[in-house]
Amino acid sequence: EQVIARNPQVALVLPEQEFDRQLVLAGPSSHLTLEGLHMDFMRLTHEGAQYREVPHYGCILEYDGFRVLIAGDCAVADPQLRDFIGSRPIDLALWNFPLGTIRKGRHFIEQAIRPEHLVVYHLPFSHDDRWGYRDAAVKGAGQLQGVPDVRLLLEPFQREILT
């Protein structure tokens, strides 16, 4: 609600009705274009058996030929995500950290996504990391092969500039 109040021009796209002024995703896939930004959405399987029924979509954003993949909380190595990407080159993949800490997830990144840049997010803050997730994410990132640029968002409000 704060985002909408501060940015009244924003367009919210969600899989369930949450706000009065939003677009609701429905069906297996959707496409939306706003001012030159092309957005492809695909229903994906949510990670975790207890969340399988939660509506979840991945998204490929494209602007001026630059493609960004946001897979969100999709299942590790989801074949639907592989199909969704197809042969499209991915310039930047925003990747939820747990998916890159296991071999199956790293292999999927290397073989199916093949991004030029990978930004790993959703890591706990250092004072909240009682299970060692940050160290596991750093180790997993170091084991990725064939991804030219891997970055981890480890600090609050961290900013990265891609070149």
For each of these PLM feature ranges, what is it?
Residues 1-31:
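Active-site HxH/HxHxD metal-binding segment of metal-dependent hydrolases
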